[in-house]
Regions:
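N-terminal membrane-targeting hydrophobic helices
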Residues: 1-130
Length: 130
């Protein structure tokens, strides 16, 4: 279920965003939103490239707590920058949801993660602690 939700949020939900909020140009917007998945190229800069229990939010350069405010600032610019900001922020949210799934499956696995405190706080607020 975790993988389904993760890929649904990455690939299908942006289509809903494009159609609902940018009806006249939804195809272009959807392509831009999908293109923001290129932010995952920062995964190639670490070793190992894939680690099953690693939360990308707060760990990878373009998923860092320094990069996320820049993505928020993009919302205040004109197209296409605001659409890029929407895509990047939604990507971070999607990855964070994935981190929550993993965190609640194995908290000790994330004890050294940069996002540990945030994951713990959000899990407590949502009442999804195990």
């Amino acid at each position: 279920m975790q993988s389904f939700i993760h890929y649904f949020l990455h690939l299908v939900f942006p289509l809903f965003i494009a159609i609902v909020f940018f009806r006249k140009e939804w195809k272009k917007v959807y392509i831009v939103l999908l293109a923001t998945m290129l932010v995952d190229l920062d995964h190639l800069l670490v070793s190992p490239i894939f680690q099953s229990n690693r939360c990308s939010v707060g760990f990878h350069y373009l998923h860092s707590f320094y990069a996320i405010p820049v993505y928020f600032i993009l919302l205040f610019f004109r197209k296409p920058f605001n659409i890029i900001g929407i895509g990047l922020l939604f990507h971070m949210l999607t990855d964070f949801v994935d981190c929550l799934f993993m965190f609640n499956g194995c908290k000790i696995c994330f004890s050294e993660a940069p996002a540990f405190q945030l994951l713990e706080t959000i899990s407590d607020l949502l009442g999804i602690t195990t």
